[in-house]
């Protein structure tokens, strides 16, 4: 879980665009972020297993 200070720091605008980091809005995780779903891989997996992410289905072959 990300520290509260790091989440607040990421919300502030940076002087340089390159320094901005995408964060998961649910848990604040900065890594493994999926832009399409606007969340990290862990939250994406948790919510998709519950069926709360539209368009995501479990694959079977």
From Swiss-Prot:
The keyword Ribonucleoprotein applies. Zn(2+) binds at residues 24, 27, 40, 43. The keyword Lipid biosynthesis does not apply. One of its GO terms (cellular component) is cytoplasm. InterPro entries: Ribosomal_uS14, Ribosomal_uS14_bact, Ribosomal_uS14_CS, Ribosomal_uS14_sf. Its cofactor is Zn(2+). GO terms for molecular function: rRNA binding; structural constituent of ribosome; zinc ion binding. SUPFAM superfamilies: Glucocorticoid receptor-like (DNA-binding domain). Keywords: Metal-binding, Ribonucleoprotein, Ribosomal protein, RNA-binding, rRNA-binding, Zinc. Binds 1 zinc ion per subunit. Pfam families: Ribosomal_S14 (PF00253). GO terms for biological process: translation. Part of the 30S ribosomal subunit. Contacts proteins S3 and S10. PANTHER family: 30S RIBOSOMAL PROTEIN S14, SMALL RIBOSOMAL SUBUNIT PROTEIN US14M. Binds 16S rRNA, required for the assembly of 30S particles and may also be responsible for determining the conformation of the 16S rRNA at the A site. Belongs to the universal ribosomal protein uS14 family. Zinc-binding uS14 subfamily. This is Small ribosomal subunit protein uS14. It comes from Citrifermentans bemidjiense (strain ATCC BAA-1014 / DSM 16622 / JCM 12645 / Bem). The gene is rpsZ.
